[in-house]
């Protein structure tokens, strides 16, 4: 299909540079979302390791871990699709080059941070709520290290595995952009919302990734704050409250609740984009500085969270709501700051090692790199 015969529905690549406002908001969201993921995984220190979770703590976890934090993964897929699909055009050379880059940037860190956990289990010992050498041997060392049909040893890294699969099959998404972009968007959403009740599935991965490319190629104005950002944010707050109290409100059909939950994740994308527009967030020097190492924080946050909480619980057993809520935030934020400092040190002292560990991601010298 040549350019002269290009139909009106075909979504071509967006070749212009990203608007500075959009670039800064994406950058700061990286560390914000990673922070939410660290906090979410650290919640097990309260729900699993502490007897008698308080009512206030349970409500906080239901709102944050049960709804707000769930937005992080689809938003990461949406951002990845936005940045990748906005310019990528399919050719054998381009596809091969992309696969080589993703092998370095995704697969190598994925294998490294799973393999070092295998070594930890073998030489040091088990890690509470994460596993042991006997466990991974019984499950299959190769299978668990690569996460084939199961969660990988370092369970949060399933995201990298799924993202790599999405990149491998990205030519299919480009065909949708060429022939039927709207049909592709609706089809992937229906598959995600209706086929599997789980919030995170390959259907959802592909939908969010495709949505990012769709937004980029339709040139939706993302700068500043538009009416749809305000409306979507308000609806997210309202629907989150409805889902938290769905039983008293009479929403007892689980299939209905699941569909509403996934619709709310979409509203969550808008909510976080709106939040990133606030100057205190978008122009925050510290957040931009930390964003340089957000990938390292993600890669290393487990088993760091589990080990830190084990040590902390040895000297402090939170017994009421105030203490349990404090434990949740202190343990999560402490790990984030600690890993950021570690990343700063490694990137300065051994930049080549840091580049290998993080898939050749060398932090820029600018504050919002």
Put a short name on every predicted segment.
Residues 45, 311-315:
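A short secondary-structure junction motif
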Residues 61-74, 148-162, 193-211, 224, ...:
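Interfacial loop-to-helix transition and helix-capping segments at the boundaries
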Residues 39-42, 186-200, 235-248, 303:
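Aromatic-anchored segments of alpha-helical transmembrane domains
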Residues 1-188, 319-369:
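Membrane-cytosol interface segments of multi-pass membrane proteins
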Residues 4-17, 221-289, 293-296, 303-312, ...:
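Alpha-helical transmembrane segments and terminal signal-anchor/GPI-anchor hydrophobic tails
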Residues 134-148, 188, 200-218, 222-232:
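Long hydrophobic alpha-helical segments that form multi-pass transmembrane helix bundles
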Residues 22-23, 90-98, 172-181, 217-229, ...:
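Membrane-interface helix-boundary motifs at transmembrane edges
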Residues 73-85, 164-171, 198-225, 241, ...:
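Specific transmembrane alpha-helix
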């Amino acid at each position: 299909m040549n350019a002269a015969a290009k139909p009106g529905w075909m979504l071509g690549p967006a070749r212009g540079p990203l608007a500075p406002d959009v670039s800064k908001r994406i950058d700061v969201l990286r560390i914000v979302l990673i922070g939410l993921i660290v906090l979410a995984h650290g919640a097990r220190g309260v729900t699993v390791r502490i007897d008698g979770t308080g009512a206030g703590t349970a409500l906080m976890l239901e709102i944050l871990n049960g709804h707000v934090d769930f937005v992080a993964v689809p938003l990461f897929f949406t951002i990845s699709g936005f940045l990748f699909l906005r310019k990528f055009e399919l050719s054998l050379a381009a596809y091969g080059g992309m696969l080589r880059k993703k092998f370095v940037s995704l697969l190598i860190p994925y294998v490294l941070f799973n393999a070092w956990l295998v070594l930890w289990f073998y030489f040091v010992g088990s890690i509470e709520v994460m596993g042991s050498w006997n466990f991974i041997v019984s499950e299959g060392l190769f299978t668990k290290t690569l996460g084939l049909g199961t969660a990988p040893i370092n369970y949060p890294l399933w995201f990298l595995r799924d993202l790599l699969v999405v990149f491998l099959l990205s030519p299919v998404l480009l065909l949708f952009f060429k022939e039927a972009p709207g049909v592709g968007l609706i089809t992937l959403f229906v598959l995600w919302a209706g086929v599997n009740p789980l919030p995170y599935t390959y259907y959802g991965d592909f939908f969010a990734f495709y949505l990012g490319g769709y937004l980029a190629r339709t040139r939706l104005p993302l700068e500043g704050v538009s009416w749809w950002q305000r409306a979507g944010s308000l609806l997210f707050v309202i629907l989150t409250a409805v889902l938290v109290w769905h039983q008293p409100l009479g929403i007892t059909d689980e299939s209905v609740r699941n569909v509403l939950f996934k619709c709310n994740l979409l509203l969550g994308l808008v909510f976080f984009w709106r939040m990133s527009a606030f100057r205190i967030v978008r122009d925050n020097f510290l957040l931009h500085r930390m964003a340089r190492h957000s990938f390292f924080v993600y890669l290393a946050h487990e088993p760091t969270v589990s080990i830190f909480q084990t040590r902390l619980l040895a000297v402090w057993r939170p017994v009421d709501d105030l203490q349990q809520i404090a434990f949740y935030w202190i343990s999560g934020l402490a790990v984030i700051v600690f890993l950021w400092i570690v990343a700063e040190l490694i990137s300065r002292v051994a930049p080549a090692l840091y580049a290998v560990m993080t898939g050749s991601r060398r932090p820029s010298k600018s504050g919002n790199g």
